[in-house]
Amino acid sequence: MIALDTNILVRYLVQDDPAQGRIATRLLEGELSSDNQGFVTIVAVLELDWVLRTQYGFSPQIVSDTIFGLMSSPHLTFENSDAIKTALGFQHGDLADNILHETGAANACTRTVTFDKKFSRLAGVELLT
């Protein structure tokens, strides 16, 4: 298994640097396989979300669809994929907050607490006042 840095995923998806795009494509479409998978950490997913939205102007829905697409690859394994999939399905809040909440729930946390009013609208998240 090979851990993939966020910039590999960005170059593969965006293809804005021709040389690096070709290298990333060769890795993801040629070298990786079911026996030699790429590993994508939660940190890389969060960075990918941020980069695609802030640097490339992708909408949250396009980012979500893009990450779901990557997750469907049999050549990629995602850290805590269930939490990522659930977090991507939420209609509000940002991905980092949603993954934080889902990861907590998956680790037997009974609630998530925050000072963030928007985040507190999610079921199971409590606004501390």
Role assignments for model-derived ranges:
Residues 1-40, 55-60, 121-122, 129:
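Short, well-structured N-terminal submotif of metal-dependent ribonuclease cores
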Residues 30-31, 70, 107:
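Hydrophobic helix-cap positions at the C-terminus of alpha-helices
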Residues 41-45, 64-91:
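Acidic catalytic patch
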